[in-house]
């Protein structure tokens, strides 16, 4: 007896998990990825990059956030791997756009994030959770 894969999949209801890189995969900078299941999105990094000289007048580039804007009700948190601008630089733009989700970062990255958000005067809305640094 043949079994239809789609029927088995529906019956077993396996977890649907997506890993998507918004930017930073084939370039240096603008690191931003997310993990998504049916009800949740967790971002990993929120970086920016600096344009080449031929993009005169543009100060920095951030990831394309269209998908996240459409699904902001699912965004639960942002995990920061480290405090370089190519991993935290877009936070001042991403956080307000997504309703200020929780940000998880190590102690050094946390301090850099606070400084960056003070520059943009949005530090009061930050929900930052310091993670233990592994040695």
Model-identified regions with their sequence ranges:
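Metallo-beta-lactamase
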Residues: 2-11, 109-135
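Short Pro/Gly-enriched beta-strand edge/turn motifs at strand-loop
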Residues: 12-18
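Conserved structured core elements
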Residues: 16, 29, 85-88, 107
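Divalent metal-coordination and catalytic microenvironments
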Residues: 19, 35, 45, 82-83
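Short Gly/Pro-enriched turn/cap motifs at secondary-structure boundaries
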Residues: 23-25
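Pre-active-site segment of Zn-dependent metallo-hydrolases
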Residues: 27-30, 39-80, 92-101, 105-109, ...
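Hydrophobic alpha-helical bundles that form the membrane domains of multi-pass transporters
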Residues: 82-90, 132-133
């Amino acid at each position: 007896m043949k079994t239809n894969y789609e029927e088995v999949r529906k019956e077993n209801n396996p977890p649907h998990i997506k890993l998507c890189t918004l930017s930073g995969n084939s370039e240096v900078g603008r690191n931003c990825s997310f993990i998504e299941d049916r009800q949740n999105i967790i971002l990993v990094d929120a970086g920016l990059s600096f344009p080449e000289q031929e993009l005169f007048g543009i100060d920095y580039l951030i990831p394309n956030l269209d998908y996240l804007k459409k699904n902001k009700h699912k965004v639960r948190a942002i995990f920061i791997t480290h405090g370089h601008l190519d991993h935290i630089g877009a936070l001042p733009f991403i956080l307000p756009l997504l309703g200020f989700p929780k940000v998880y970062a190590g102690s050094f990255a946390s301090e850099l994030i606070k400084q960056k958000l003070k520059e943009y005067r949005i530090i009061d809305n930050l929900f930052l959770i310091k993670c233990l640094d592994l040695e």
